[in-house]
Design a protein with these regions (language model features):
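A glycine-rich phosphate-binding loop feature that marks nucleotide/adenosyl-phosphate handling sites
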Residues: 14-16, 72-79, 129-140, 190-204
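Generic secondary-structure signature for well-ordered alpha-helical cores
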Residues: 2-6, 26, 57-65, 119-126, ...
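Acidic, glycine/GT-rich loop-and beta-edge segments that sit at the periphery of enzyme/chaperone cores
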Residues: 3, 175-221
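Short, hydrophobic/amphipathic alpha-helical packing segments
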Residues: 53, 111-119, 170-174
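Glycine-rich phosphate-binding loop of actin/hexokinase-like ATP-binding domains
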Residues: 2-51, 144-167
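Gly/charged contiguous loops adjacent to phosphate- or pyrophosphate-bearing nucleotide/cofactor binding elements
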Residues: 54-109
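Catalytic phosphate/nucleotide-handling subdomain of diverse soluble enzymes
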Residues: 24-29, 127-192
Length: 221
């Protein structure tokens, strides 16, 4: 459990909604943002959200899109098909994904909302040195962290602290039940921990809109 650690940890679970939390082991601040379908692969897309991040980073590196997300030349009207073997450096994969300008814009909006949310939490906690970034769920398990940094979904400086933690809702509930049963976690301490959780509404936070607009760009930061 991330509040068991006497260090600053960030937790991110991405899907149609993006749930985020930051803790120093005692205090915890949580929030959520609507990411839309982009991190689920988009409507009608037979591709995972983590693949969308990798493909977008590939298009950026190849100059097919620029930092504003604009597709070059004929791709703006026609879209582009990208082989996952190229985007994800996975030789032998014959799968490809077709993306339009709208797909890129959808990903930009989702990415901006999550990155701005992360920054709000970080600043609310006092801009600490982050010791670990935990990515939950299937998205986090398969996410290419380098690609996430290339498009600015995560700060470049946090790459080496980032790790996938799997199905945390199930694992966390199991671990908590086990710790309560064995006495490792006392009910009094659990209640105190829960009382120390602060939930914030991103729309009400100062400079959130400004950060959201800034992070629409696809660039490392």
């Amino acid at each position: 459990l991330i509040w068991d650690k006497d260090e600053f940890s960030l937790f991110i679970d991405l899907g149609t909604n993006g749930e985020m939390a930051i803790t120093d082991g005692k205090r915890m601040i949580v929030t959520a943002t609507a990411a839309g379908p982009a991190f689920e692969g988009g409507p009608g897309k037979a591709v995972a959200g983590s693949d969308m991040v990798a493909v977008t980073a590939f298009l950026l590196k190849e100059g097919i899109i620029d930092e504003t997300g604009l597709m070059a030349g004929p791709y703006f009207e026609e879209g582009v098909t990208v082989a996952l073997s190229d985007a994800m450096n996975a030789p032998g994969s014959s799968d490809g994904v077709y993306l339009t300008q709208k797909d890129i814009r959808d990903l930009q909006m989702a990415k901006a909302a999550v990155r701005a949310g992360v920054e709000v939490l970080w600043k609310k906690m006092g801009c600490p040195e982050i010791s670990q970034v935990c990515l939950a769920g299937g998205f986090g398990y398969y996410l290419d962290v380098d690609a996430a940094a290339v498009i600015g979904l995560l700060p470049e400086k946090w790459k080496r602290y980032t790790r996938a933690v799997g199905n945390t809702s199930l694992a966390g509930a199991f671990q908590m039940g086990k710790d309560l049963w064995t006495g490792r976690l006392q009910e009094e301490r659990l209640n105190k921990t829960l009382q120390g959780i602060e939930s914030i509404n991103l729309a009400e936070q100062e400079n959130f809109e400004e950060m959201y607009i800034r992070y629409m760009n696809l660039q490392s930061s």
